[in-house]
From Swiss-Prot:
Official protein name in the record: DNA-binding transcriptional activator EvgA
SUPFAM superfamilies: C-terminal effector domain of the bipartite response regulators (SSF46894), CheY-like (SSF52172)
Keyword list, A-Z: Activator, Cytoplasm, DNA-binding, Phosphoprotein, Transcription, Transcription regulation, Two-component regulatory system
GO CC entries: cytoplasm
Domain of life assignment: Bacteria
DNA-binding feature ranges: 161-180
Organism of provenance: Shigella flexneri
Pfam family, one: Response_reg
Domain Response regulatory: start-end pairs: 2-117
Function: Member of the two-component regulatory system EvgS/EvgA. Regulates the expression of emrKY operon and yfdX. Also seems to control expression of at least one other multidrug efflux operon.
Modification sites for 4-aspartylphosphate: 52
GO aspect biological process, one term: regulation of DNA-templated transcription
């Protein structure tokens, strides 16, 4: 099997590379940003794509969504040091085969790949957390739409309404609508509240 790694952290890339090579998986390419990722995947046609959520340019979830929309059928494993419930759920919804928390160790990537090869998904959290035992913050995060999540990430990156509108190909008015909705859903009355919420839940 072969793989493409998409991660902007040199140490993470090295750890993933070494892990894959030890398990007889060939590395076709190592990318540090999301802008060229879809094109490279479509050109090289790897069996496996490993993507960090927090890559520059086009983020990991957007790369995942685009690949699935363009009928890429290989194994996609998302890795992140961020909130595993929040990002894991959205990655599952977007078509990832697995989600691996960097905090739990990179070795789980191999477990995720093996699960995907055998027709299973690998998300190391109980689905019961999605329906029965969510914390208040997690319930709020789960209520956000994909568009609201994108707007939130851009806000946390310091982008203003004009920047967000340009990146999402929507109007300033629509950005304001999404912003108002997400602030209401998260019960944040100011941007400082939003930053505090994001820091508390390791989002950003």
């Amino acid at each position: 099997m072969n793989a493409i790694i998409i991660d902007d952290h040199p140490l993470a890339i090295a750890a993933i590379r070494n892990l894959l090579i030890k398990n007889d998986i060939e590395i076709l390419a190592e990318l540090t940003e999301g802008g060229s990722a879809v094109q490279r995947v479509e050109t090289l046609k790897p069996d496996i794509v490993i993507i960090d959520v927090d890559i520059p340019g086009v983020n990991g979830i957007q790369v995942l969504e685009t690949l699935r929309k363009r009928q890429y059928s290989g194994i996609i494993i998302i890795v992140s040091a961020k909130n595993d419930h929040f990002y894991g759920k959205h990655c599952a919804d977007a078509g990832a085969n697995g989600f691996v928390s960097k905090k739990e160790g990179m070795n789980n990537i191999i477990a995720a790949i093996e699960a995907a090869k055998n027709g299973y998904c690998y998300f190391p959290f109980s689905l019961n957390r999605f329906v029965g035992s969510l914390t208040s913050d997690q319930q709020k995060l789960d209520s956000l739409s994909k568009q609201e999540i994108s707007v939130m990430r851009y806000i946390l990156d310091g982008k203003d309404n004009n920047d967000i509108a340009e990146k999402m190909f929507i109007s300033n008015k629509t950005v304001s609508t999404y912003k108002s909705r997400l602030m209401e859903k998260l019960e944040c009355k100011s941007l400082m509240d939003l930053y505090t919420f994001a820091q508390r839940n390791k989002i950003g």
